């Protein structure tokens, strides 16, 4: 059978299932696909097909993630589900699977557990704007008061981490019963997807964001000027636009006098394009790898920030020993390494391999960073951790 063509005119949203181990994240993912397949909006997936998630690499870190896609009447979704807790942590911190929203799965039989809290905190730190709650295994908890209690607990937990606990939709259901085709519980999947459709905001498309290109290479074309090459991370750029060169040195302005991609000249480049940008009045020595070209005023160079990081385990190629206060590794942002010093959070004595925690970083030279910027932590050329900037200090 030919792969189903998805309707690209629908709004596209990236979501994922999060929550404590064995609360039913993968079963719910399978139930959503199987239910929507009946409506022609997905390919039915069995639990095992999702659970044997393939390995992928992001920022030098191996992560197991299952990707499924489906559509409702209003939207097209890419949905991620991770088999293990560590995969979630790595996924969220590296941004390997971008999440515009999440479905938090909580078993009514257990209530919120440690990983429930951790996933909510991580979602907050990495900027997931909203989530919908699926109270699972309600077929096993017939006492409505017990379900009410768990729901109240989840709402309070969401509020304590800065989400809108009062207005977050909470759907009570049974992923397993829905997957088995029980109509009563299938209706709950319908209710869940209606909530996801309405409550999780449609993200701003990358092309509508302010222009940014990470500089990979710089060359001179005799008689024409300096050409900067790299991938357009977001936004669009047109001929004769003004850009700023940000990071490492003082910020400078330049005018775009030419653009090309795959040896063809263009009038416009947009998010996702690998392009060469010709800049007027800029010397070869004025630009270097690691800087960015950006829409004027849209991003500033910073040296100090707070971040949420994950330290690789020894088996993942990470360090064998803990990191102490004052540790000075390289921080790899976009296309370059910059040395920086780590200050641990109050009360934290060390970071052990496999931990995820909050740190403060002071770089030796300023880099174009903003809240949500992703980076790798490297030592002697190998990746020992990954992080997300959660707050810029200076």
Swiss-Prot record:
Its EC number is 3.6.5.3. InterPro entries: EF-Tu_GTP-bd, EF-Tu_GTPase, EFTu-like_2, EFTU_2, G_TR_CS, P-loop_NTPase, Small_GTP-bd, T_Tr_GTP-bd_dom. GTP binds at residues 19-26, 81-85, 136-139. It is found in: Cytoplasm. Residues 81-84 are annotated as: G3. One of its GO terms (molecular function) is GTPase activity. Residues 10-204 form the tr-type G domain. It comes from the Bacteria. Disulfide bonds: none annotated. CDD domains: EF_Tu, EFTU_II, EFTU_III. Keywords: Cytoplasm, Elongation factor, GTP-binding, Hydrolase, Magnesium, Metal-binding, Nucleotide-binding, Protein biosynthesis. Residues 19-26 are annotated as: G1. GO terms for cellular component: cytosol. Residues 136-139 are annotated as: G4. Mg(2+) binds at residue 26. It catalyses: GTP + H2O = GDP + phosphate + H(+). Residues 60-64 are annotated as: G2. PANTHER family: ELONGATION FACTOR TU, MITOCHONDRIAL, ELONGATION FACTOR TU-RELATED. GTP hydrolase that promotes the GTP-dependent binding of aminoacyl-tRNA to the A-site of ribosomes during protein biosynthesis. Belongs to the TRAFAC class translation factor GTPase superfamily. Classic translation factor GTPase family. EF-Tu/EF-1A subfamily. NCBIfam families: EF-Tu, PRK00049.1, PRK12735.1, PRK12736.1, small_GTP. This is Elongation factor Tu. It comes from Malacoplasma penetrans (strain HF-2) (Mycoplasma penetrans). The gene is tuf.
């Amino acid at each position: 059978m030919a792969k189903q063509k998805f309707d690209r005119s629908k709004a596209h949203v990236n979501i994922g299932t999060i929550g404590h181990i064995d609360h039913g994240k993968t079963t719910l993912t399978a139930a959503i696909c199987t239910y929507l397949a009946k409506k022609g909006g997905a390919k039915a997936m069995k639990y095992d097909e999702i659970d044997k998630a393939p390995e992928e690499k992001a920022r030098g870190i191996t992560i197991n993630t299952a990707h499924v896609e489906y559509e409702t009447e209003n939207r097209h979704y890419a949905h991620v589900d991770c088999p293990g807790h560590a995969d979630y942590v790595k996924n969220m911190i590296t941004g390997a699977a971008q999440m515009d929203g999440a479905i938090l799965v909580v078993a009514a039989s257990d209530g919120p557990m440690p990983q429930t809290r951790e996933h909510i905190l991580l979602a907050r730190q990495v900027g997931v704007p909203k989530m919908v709650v699926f109270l699972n295994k309600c077929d096993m908890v017939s006492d409505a008061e017990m379900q009410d209690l768990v729901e109240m607990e989840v709402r309070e937990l969401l509020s304590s981490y800065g989400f809108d606990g009062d207005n977050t939709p909470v759907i009570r259901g049974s992923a397993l019963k829905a997957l088995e085709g029980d109509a009563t519980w299938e209706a709950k999947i319908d209710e869940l997807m209606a909530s996801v459709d309405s409550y999780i905001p449609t993200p701003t498309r990358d092309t509508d964001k302010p222009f940014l290109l990470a500089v990979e290479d710089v060359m001179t074309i005799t008689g024409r000027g300096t050409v900067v090459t790299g991938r357009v991370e977001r936004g669009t750029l047109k001929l004769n636009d003004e850009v700023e060169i940000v990071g490492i040195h003082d910020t400078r302005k330049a005018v775009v006098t030419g653009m090309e991609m795959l040896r063809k000249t263009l009038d416009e480049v947009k998010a996702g394009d690998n392009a060469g940008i010709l800049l007027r009045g800029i010397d070869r020595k004025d630009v270097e790898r690691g800087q960015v070209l950006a829409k004027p005023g849209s991003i500033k160079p910073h040296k100090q920030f707070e971040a949420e990081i994950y330290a690789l385990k020894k088996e993942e190629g990470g360090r064998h020993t803990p990191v102490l206060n004052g540790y000075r590794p390289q921080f790899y942002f976009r296309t370059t390494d910059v040395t920086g010093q780590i200050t641990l959070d109050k009360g934290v004595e060390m970071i052990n391999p496999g931990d995820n925690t909050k740190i403060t970083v002071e770089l030796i030279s300023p880099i174009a960073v903003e809240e949500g910027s992703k980076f790798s932590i490297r030592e002697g050329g190998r990746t020992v951790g990954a992080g997300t900037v959660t707050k810029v200090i200076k």
